[in-house]
Amino acid sequence: MQQHLYFLGIGGTLMGSLALLAKDLGHTVSGSDAKIYPPMSDLLANADITVQ
């Protein structure tokens, strides 16, 4: 069952990694963070995960 998951603090190592895992499992993923920097910003962008 596909779900839309929204991650707060998605730019961090833990939350970003969980977001990438959820995307790999077929879920729709988006999230937000106050500040996000490479390499996590690049990884999320390459996975087509929307970050606000």
Question: Model-found features: residue ranges?
Answer:
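N-terminal leader/targeting and accessory segments in enzymes
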Residues: 1-52
